């Protein structure tokens, strides 16, 4: 089997990273950082299967449009998660898509006194956990999800975002 045909190992998720046209690369982490953050989230959730997802980093206008269209909320938010919807019986490594709004992530990091890179790590881990089916609507679910976030971020040397 050639390298191009090989399925990525669970420890090496396939991450497709894109940035909105015209969005400055300043402050937006590189692809290897996103892969490490995805890998940490998958490890914390004990997902061992191969995984593939897309991450799109957007500006305020695009972030607002996504949130308005899919959540009926007229503002840009930090991260949106779109789990893959596969037909019954189809098993692919595709987890789904994450949308990260760069200006919102940057503003929140500044307001919360966090390093920008650490906040990107947190939002990526948070989004991946949503793709895996975790949520934070009910308190017990939120506690479980936050515990997994802390575990993943600790592996990355990122301080507890909830402390």
Predicted feature descriptions by range:
Residues 1-120, 131-163:
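An acidic/histidine-cluster motif and surrounding catalytic segment
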Residues 123:
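Extended, folded domain segments that form the structural surfaces/walls around functional sites
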């Amino acid at each position: 089997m050639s390298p191009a045909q090989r399925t990525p190992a669970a420890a090496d998720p396939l991450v497709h990273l894109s940035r909105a046209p015209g969005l400055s690369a300043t402050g937006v982490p590189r692809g290897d950082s996103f892969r490490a953050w995805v890998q940490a989230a998958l490890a914390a959730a004990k997902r061992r299967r191969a995984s593939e997802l897309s991450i799109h980093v957007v500006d305020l206008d695009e972030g607002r449009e996504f949130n308005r269209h899919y959540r009926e909320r007229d503002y840009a938010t930090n991260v949106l998660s779109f789990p893959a919807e596969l037909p019954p019986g189809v098993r692919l490594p595709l987890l789904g898509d994450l949308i990260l709004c760069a200006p919102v992530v940057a503003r929140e990091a500044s307001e919360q006194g966090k390093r920008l890179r650490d906040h990107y790590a947190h939002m990526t881990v948070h989004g991946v956990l949503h793709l895996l089916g975790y949520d934070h609507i009910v308190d017990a679910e939120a506690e479980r999800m936050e515990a997994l976030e802390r575990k993943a971020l600790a592996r990355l040397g990122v301080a507890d975002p909830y402390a």
